[in-house]
Regions:
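Transmembrane helix-loop-helix hairpins at membrane boundaries of multipass inner-membrane proteins
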Residues: 1-2, 16-106, 471-472
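Structural signature of hydrophobic alpha-helical transmembrane segments
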Residues: 1-9, 71-82, 124-137, 199-212, ...
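Central hydrophobic cores of alpha-helical transmembrane segments in multi-pass inner-membrane proteins
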Residues: 2-18, 31-45, 81-93, 111-113, ...
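C-terminal ends of transmembrane helices
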Residues: 13-25, 86-98, 139-153, 214-228, ...
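Membrane-interfacial loop-to-helix junctions in multi-pass inner-membrane proteins
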Residues: 23-34, 97-111, 125-128, 146-167, ...
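Juxtamembrane/interfacial segments at transmembrane-helix boundaries in multi-pass membrane proteins
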Residues: 48-66, 166-220, 225, 254-268, ...
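Alpha-helical multi-pass transmembrane bundles of energy-transducing inner-membrane proteins
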Residues: 116-198, 283-347
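Predominantly late transmembrane helices and immediately cytosolic-facing juxtamembrane segments
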Residues: 217, 331-337, 400-434
Length: 476
């Protein structure tokens, strides 16, 4: 029942929130997200038996599809990321006002429902259903509550994701008709014996859909604009959690179903990913807008994760799984700071800011910790995952690894430059009357900083969660 609760708590709360007026909608959203977090923690620390982590019920028997959910190590990690992120997002942005707030929070909770379903589904049609459920509310969140260019940006986002979803649906149906008894069960997809040509065609149908969602070069062009124009709470969901849908799907669905195609296309995908890392890092160095800088930084991080997956070894895959969680937590922290600064000063431009450490020393200290995590310094949570990913890449190809390592230097440059421009030097007009951020923001940043330090010093619990998935993917 644990997987069912992880899905139905935000679903029921989201539907109910549509009818709640005033501050009650945000209070209900926060309360339901805390309840979901409690269930997620129980799944990891208390109800660890397989019987609590699996659920199977009839759904549409005439189509050969069932409502099958499963919690393995990777699912636990990503459902925990989703569960911990939403209360942090709701609490950190609690004082933000939204027109028709009940609709805003209802759509956010429906997005959480879809995300949970994606990470839990063990039936491919059910997976596709939740994939769309996670995406569709975001269209409305961006188009209704976004910035001045929200309509054009949302349309671009829609075109990209619709194309990806269509290709994935074609791939799902192709595999469905290849199964002996017309089944959507993941175990039946794993058991398929496809020819090299069938694997190659199906592989690309799925991979393009997942690459758009991550996104990696050259499928990334929707992302910076979407992050810039979306409400910051939505941007946190997009960059902290939703991009992990694509990475999760590559690990849990793509590589196990099409192992031969994954190996034969590995070099091409690794090269594209590393090109994307370097390209995004160089573009990030030129950004004056905090949101766009963080967006391009995220593209670089995701590029490394994709490259490490297709290094096709267990050490790289362990690093990716650890980094999915850590990147999600860290980037949400960066967005919280960006939103707090914009709320206080009215600007996101680095050239119009400075000296904030004198006005908001607590915020400065926390942001420096997050900046260190963004460049994966030792004793931060990002270090272990990044170290393992580069180890995996090194086993795959030394020269590609050397090129990828340049992105670390570039990340240090643009991240520390952002710290310097925001917090040090003399105060400017925008920051002269600025004070410390609200208590709610400080508390949520403190939670994130604790996670950064705890998993930086003691990452073993996260490493343990990766074992069963790594063994399943590589058949050990």
């Amino acid at each position: 029942m644990i997987p069912v609760l992880l899905i139905f708590i935000p679903l029921v709360a989201g539907l109910f929130t549509f009818f709640v007026k005033g501050n009650g909608s945000k209070q209900l959203a926060l309360a339901s997200s805390v309840a979901t977090l409690a269930i997620s923690l129980l799944s990891i620390f208390v109800y660890t038996s397989v019987k609590f982590g699996n659920f199977d019920a009839s759904w549409i028997p005439t189509l050969g599809t069932r409502f099958t959910l499963s919690l393995d190590g990777m699912s636990k990690m990503l459902t925990l990321l989703t569960a911990i992120s939403f209360p942090i997002i709701f609490a950190a942005t609690y004082k933000n006002e939204y027109k028709n707030a009940n609709q805003f929070y209802a759509l956010m909770l429906l997005t959480q429902t879809g995300l949970m379903g994606v990470f839990l589904a063990a039936d491919c049609l059910l997976f596709y259903f939740f994939w769309e459920l996670a995406i569709i509310p975001v269209y409305f969140l961006c188009s209704i509550w976004g910035g001045e260019k929200r309509i054009a940006v949302t349309f671009k986002f829609f075109v990209y994701t619709f194309l990806g979803s269509l290709l994935m649906l074609v791939g799902i149906l192709f595999l469905y008709f290849k199964t002996p008894h017309h089944s959507f069960a993941i175990k039946d997809f794993y058991a398929l014996k496809l020819t090299a040509q069938e694997q190659s065609l199906s592989f690309w149908l799925f991979f393009i859909a997942f690459a758009i969602k991550m996104p990696i070069f050259p499928f990334h062009t929707w992302q910076p604009d979407a992050y810039e124009q979306s409400p910051t709470a939505v941007t946190m969901v997009l960059s902290g959690i939703m991009v992990k849908m694509g990475i999760f799907a590559v690990i849990g669905w793509l590589v196990p179903i099409f192992p031969d195609a994954a190996h034969s296309n590995a070099m091409l995908i690794v090269v594209l990913s590393v090109i994307g890392m370097l390209y995004a890092s160089l573009i990030a160095m030129k950004q004056d807008d905090m949101k766009r800088l963080i967006a391009y930084s995220s593209i670089a991080h995701i590029g490394l994760m994709c490259a490490a997956i297709f290094s096709m070894n267990d050490i790289g895959l362990k690093g990716v799984m650890i980094q999915m969680f850590n990147h999600g937590i860290n980037v949400i922290g960066l967005w919280i700071v960006a939103d707090a600064i914009e709320q206080k000063t009215g600007t996101r431009k680095l050239s119009e800011l400075g000296g904030l450490a004198h006005k908001a020393p607590v915020l400065a200290i926390m942001f420096v910790v997050l900046a260190f995590a963004n460049i994966a310094l030792p004793l931060t949570n990002a270090f272990v995952g990044e170290f393992l990913m580069f180890n995996g890449l090194f086993e795959f190809n030394v020269y590609i690894t050397a090129a990828a390592l340049i992105s670390i230097i570039l990340a240090a440059v643009y991240t520390l430059t952002m710290v310097q421009k925001l917090f040090y030097g003399n105060t400017v007009t925008a920051t002269e009357k600025t004070g410390e951020v609200g208590t709610n923001v400080q508390l949520m940043l403190a939670v994130i900083v604790v996670v950064v330090i705890v998993f930086g010093v003691y990452p073993q619990p996260m490493i343990d969660l990766t074992k069963d998935t790594v063994n399943a993917v590589f058949g050990k």
